[in-house]
Amino acid sequence: MADEKSPTRISPHLIAASRSEMRNNMKFRPCIDIHNGKVKQVVGSSIKDEGNIAKENFVSEKGAEYYANLYKVRNLSGGHIILLNHKDSEYYEATKEQALLALNAYKGGMQIGGGINADNAREFLDAGASHVIVTSYVFSDSRLNYDNLERIYKAVGKERLVLDLSCRKKNDKYYIVTDRWQRFTDEIVNEEFMHKLAGYCDEFLIHAVDVEGKNNGIERELVKILGGFDEIPITYAGGVKSLEDIEILKKYSDGRLDFTIGSSLDLFGGRISFEEIADKY
């Protein structure tokens, strides 16, 4: 493993000042989750590579391109496309094909994650992704792998890299999980760790995996931790089931966090109006 190091970074004071101006201006970040070649909403903690299994909340009859076009028409940028199949899965190519169709439909409008590394990242950027989202590649062997972090940083640059710090709670702390949220690492999400990574990436994406897809409300403790961090934008995903949850998210994060809604959105069989969210946020 390489020595711990960090690229040249903008003054944290300037970044914090910029982020402070964004308070109370939370932004809705739409999503397209693709599993077994279909747009789906799944329970995050249920995903199993073996057998390509996941507990499904919603399976769309429409392709990923439909949703990308919808987000484009509503000028909703900065959303993410997630490939939920492992590269060795028999369904991976079908899932990837759907993702590429979505990127082509909304060039520069969406980020993409799922199996991204320094060798294939450029393919997805060239296909139209604004950013690549990376987790497992930089958290190999249960720890932060600085060699791989440097490789992806050099391959795409800070401005086009999103680090996914999706996490699950264990022993009262939030540990980053990898491999489609199946494997715990030894890295804990806290302000110190996020500060260490902020110089490498443009944003963080963080799914609260324990509540992802369960419609039980947001992970408030995690939101408090994330809301205390000012250096780069953070998108929170997991458990938003109502407009009230968005207000709670705003309160607990002081309006700093952007957010994603999945299975609770009427686009995906839920009750929250997509049109209302798109208009308001």
Q: Model-predicted segments: where are they?
A:
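Conserved anion-binding
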Residues: S46-I47, A129-L205, V211
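Catalytic cores of alpha/beta
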Residues: M110-Q111, I116-G128, E221-F229, T235-Y236, ...
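N-terminal active-site wall of soluble small-molecule enzyme domains
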Residues: V73, S77-G109, G115-E123
